[in-house]
C-alpha cells in the first residue's frame, strides 16, 4: 500500500548532513512507490506558541497567522511524518522546536500518524 510521506527538514543549513539524510530517505520512499512531500522549516515563518490554549477550544485552529496552517494541512494528509534535524546542544534546533510546540493545536489528530525522528 502506497503511503503519503511528509518530510519536515528542521536544519538551518540547506545543504548540510540533515538535508542529505532526508534526501536519501525521500529517494528510497519514492523508489518504493510512496508519495513524498517536503517542508523546509528555514523557509517558513512560524510564530512561537503563546500557550494560550485557544486551539484546544476551537477544534485545533491556532490564532497565529503564519505558515503553520500550511504545515498542519500537510500533516493531516500524511500517513508517515519524518522529522529530520541535527542535534544542537543535546536537543532539537530552534526551528524544529518551534514547529513541534505549535503542533499542540492538532495533537488529537496526530495519534494515528507514524512518526520517524
Model regions and ranges:
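Helix-loop-strand module that forms the ligand-binding subsite of alpha/beta enzymes
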Residues: 63-117
Amino acid at each position: 500500500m502506497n503511503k503519503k510521506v511528509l518530510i519536515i527538514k528542521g536544519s538551518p543549513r540547506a545543504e548540510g548532513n540533515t538535508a542529505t539524510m532526508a534526501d536519501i530517505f525521500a529517494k528510497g520512499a519514492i523508489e518504493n512507490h510512496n508519495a513524498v512531500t517536503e517542508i523546509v522549516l528555514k523557509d517558513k515563518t512560524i510564530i512561537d506558541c503563546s500557550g494560550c490554549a485557544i486551539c484546544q477550544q476551537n477544534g485545533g485552529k491556532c490564532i497565529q497567522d503564519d505558515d503553520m496552517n500550511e504545515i498542519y494541512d500537510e500533516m493531516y494528509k500524511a500517513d508517515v511524518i519524518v522529522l529530520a534535524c541535527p542535534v544542537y546542544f543535546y536537543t532539537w534546533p530552534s526551528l524544529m522546536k518551534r514547529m513541534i510546540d505549535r503542533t499542540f493545536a492538532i495533537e488529537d489528530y496526530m495519534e494515528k500518524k507514524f512518526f520517524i525522528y
